């Protein structure tokens, strides 16, 4: 999470002055939240990654929009994951591509059957009328959606995430949709804690503590880079010697020839044996994972069957008492 906020740009004080004039028109005052929200770090990482990728592709900060999915039990909402949404601008108003949303929802339902659509997210400063316009479109898909906004340009050390719900207030005799801010808590699972800890260690300056895997990959990258530069230098010398640009140095050419013959030959029987052994090990691990998943599914099926059988057996015995 800290890395998601650290990957931001800079923000000026003039933007804060403009936002301060906009916020009162879309924020409801004196309204308490009606639901309790638990937010998973994976959602924040997804939004931050979405924003950074769009900024890299476009060369400038871009507003991104996506969907929030999770679980809801009564007044308790748990936001567990998210996915991106397509949108386009018509007359300076953002229009969500609903067909794309329904396609993505169907795909997520195949993998995460227990998760449901909870709301949407975007990036930027405090809520403004354009967010109200998008929120009304989301209300056509789901009733009372959540609205999450992440500010990637803030310099504050606090988590730059705010969660809102919509309320209807009477302003000048007209029903007007406003946002009411909700309090939220962070809920993490073991896999998320490991991932967030790894991201937090990998700072943008590279001065932070790196994981063992990262250090190993960095060392390999440096070695391969040095090897590539040396081989390129030898190749350029051989080409220059053939072209007559530099005089032949038989000692250097003999060393290059010997180096080429020292390289391992990948067509040996030992290499083939080790290669096939490794392929078999990888295939076996994948096969064991599939078997484990199948056994778990069968176990759940047997448990449900036993519960149903016991209920039917009790029903038969109860009916037998009256005959």
Curated annotation (Swiss-Prot):
GO terms for molecular function: metallopeptidase activity. It is found in: Cytoplasm; Nucleus. Pfam families: JAB, MitMem_reg. One of its GO terms (biological process) is protein deneddylation. Keywords: Cytoplasm, Nucleus, Signalosome. Component of the COP9 signalosome complex (CSN), a complex involved in various cellular and developmental processes. The CSN complex is an essential regulator of the ubiquitin (Ubl) conjugation pathway by mediating the deneddylation of the cullin subunits of SCF-type E3 ligase complexes, leading to decrease the Ubl ligase activity of SCF-type complexes such as SCF, CSA or DDB2. The complex is also involved in phosphorylation of p53/TP53, c-jun/JUN, IkappaBalpha/NFKBIA, ITPK1 and IRF8, possibly via its association with CK2 and PKD kinases. GO terms for cellular component: COP9 signalosome; cytoplasm. Residues 37-170 form the MPN domain. Component of the CSN complex, composed of COPS1/GPS1, COPS2, COPS3, COPS4, COPS5, COPS6, COPS7 (COPS7A or COPS7B), COPS8 and COPS9. In the complex, it probably interacts directly with COPS2, COPS4, COPS5, COPS7 (COPS7A or COPS7B) and COPS9. Interacts with the translation initiation factor EIF3S6. Interacts weakly with RBX1. Directly interacts with COP1 and 14-3-3 protein sigma/SFN. Interacts with ERCC6. It comes from the Eukaryota. It comes from Sus scrofa. This is COP9 signalosome complex subunit 6. Belongs to the peptidase M67A family. CSN6 subfamily. Its main location: cytoplasm.
């Amino acid at each position: 999470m800290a890395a998601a906020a650290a990957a931001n740009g800079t923000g000026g004080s003039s933007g804060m002055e403009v936002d301060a004039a906009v916020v009162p028109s879309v924020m409801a005052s004196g309204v308490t939240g009606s639901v309790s929200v638990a937010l998973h770090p994976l959602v924040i990482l997804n939004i931050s990654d979405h924003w950074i990728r769009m900024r890299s592709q476009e060369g400038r900060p871009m507003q991104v929009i996506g969907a929030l999915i999770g679980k809801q039990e009564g007044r308790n909402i748990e936001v567990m994951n998210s996915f991106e949404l397509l949108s386009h601008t018509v007359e300076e108003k953002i229009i969500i591509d609903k067909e794309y949303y329904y396609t993505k929802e169907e795909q997520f339902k195949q993998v995460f059957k227990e998760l449901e659509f909870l709301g949407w997210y975007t990036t930027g400063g405090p809520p403004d009328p354009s967010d109200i316009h998008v929120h009304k479109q989301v209300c056509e898909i789901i009733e009372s959606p959540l609205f999450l906004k992440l500010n990637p340009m803030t310099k504050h050390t606090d988590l730059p995430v705010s969660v809102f719900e919509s309320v209807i207030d009477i302003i000048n005799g007209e029903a007007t949709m406003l946002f009411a801010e909700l309090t939220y808590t962070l809920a993490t699972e073991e896999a998320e804690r490991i991932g967030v800890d790894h991201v937090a260690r990998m700072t943008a300056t590279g001065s932070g503590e790196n994981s063992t895997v990262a250090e190993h990959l960095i060392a390999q990258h440096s070695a391969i880079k040095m090897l590539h530069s040396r081989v390129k230098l030898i190749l350029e010398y051989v080409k220059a010697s053939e072209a007559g640009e530099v005089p032949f140095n038989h000692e250097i050419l003999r060393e290059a020839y010997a180096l080429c013959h020292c390289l391992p030959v990948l067509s040996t029987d030992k290499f083939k044996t080790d290669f096939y052994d490794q392929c078999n090990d990888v295939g076996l691990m994948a096969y064991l994972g599939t078997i484990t998943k199948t056994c778990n599914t069968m176990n759940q099926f047997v448990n449900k069957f036993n519960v149903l059988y016991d209920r039917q057996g009790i029903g038969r015995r109860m009916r037998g008492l009256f005959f």
